[in-house]
Amino acid sequence: MNSTKQMTAGRVLFIAIVAALGGILFGYDTAVISGTTRIVADQFFLTELSKGWYVGCALIGSIIGVAVAGMLSDFLGRKKTMLISALMFSISAIGCAVSADFTQLVIFRIIGGFGIGVDSIVSPIYISEVSPAEKRGTLVSLYQLAITIGFLLAYLVNYLVLKGADLESADPALGTRMFNNEYWRGMLGMETIPDLLFLILIFFIPESPRWLEVRGQRKDNSEEWKALREPGILMAVLWGSLIAILGQFMGVNAVLYYGPEIFQNAGLSSEGSMFSTVLVGVVNMLTTVLALIIIDKVGRKQLVWWGVGGMIVCLLAIGTYFAWGSALHLGTGFLLTFFLLYVFCTAISISAVVFVLLSEMYPGRVRGLAMSIAGLALWVGTYLIGQLTPWMLQTLTPAGTFFLFAFMCLPYLYIMWKHIPETTGKTLEEIENYWKK
């Protein structure tokens, strides 16, 4: 693409960083919930079912968001669609902070989830379309790095707000309650700060040159659906959707959503479990930086092979701790070590690779719609694992749950080996030609 090549390296990097800022909001909005669940449940007298709804309602919004994001971005453009997602984040953060009751809180969480769903599709597509082939993996991985920064930011905010909160405060002023006896409001509302930065900087980046070119060739949306039924493209969408949904059943989101609860079940205090979760966030972010550096050198599939292999070992070790830890005299240090190693293996492989692959493996004329379908599969998997994890921990026991996660890594490895091409260093047009064979 000539218009892409005419941009300086610094300009492309700036554009990619701005688009990746949406990932910070994605990560923050996803992870902040872990520090608010218990106090929200106590304040609004939630049943276990209602508590699950509080955790899962944003995922419903995300599923709706990914379902429409591809068509929105193909119709309105990548830039305007990112702007819509930023506005949704703003409405959600402010609304959650001032919610008068549980119903309002759920509504604003769903709105935020919609923003996550839209951004998780459009930002990686946008970055892949403005990036040169030799740097595309690194630049799209900025989005995953931003997600991990968002996770870490949420964990730090949760830890610091809880540490500084006066839980006995009787001051009725909302501003006081927000960081004291109703500190969940402050945790959720702090998302407004990075969102404003994202919202402002979107106005300083151009529309995707590839979208501008394809826009003139597209007659209506029915052509996209027709193109999806072409044999090669249909298989690309199928395999992309399968790796998206299977990746959610390998334990990563169970750790991110329920990490503090799992650590508490292992015997850590409330503050100790929250601090351990901060360590998880630090390892997640630093490992993603490493993945960003090596992904275009090592290759997508090599990272997945080694990383998922390590995940299996760590999941088996964690399952062993919960099954036979007492008999083997294993301390909580053993659990934390393999938790952190598991996060390292996940961040260096599937977490770093998934958005890169999904954003680059589809032809430009159907990229938005195809990635929406794969993204929908990803978020359905995320929702299911969010809802099923408490049941699995209780019914299968923590040991059985982590052994199951280890087993689910095997079909993922098979699909990556047999059906997904190595895309490192290839132009988007070369990748498209692979699926046409």
Whereabouts are the PLM-identified features?
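Alpha-helical transmembrane bundle of multi-pass membrane proteins
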Residues: 1-216, 220-437
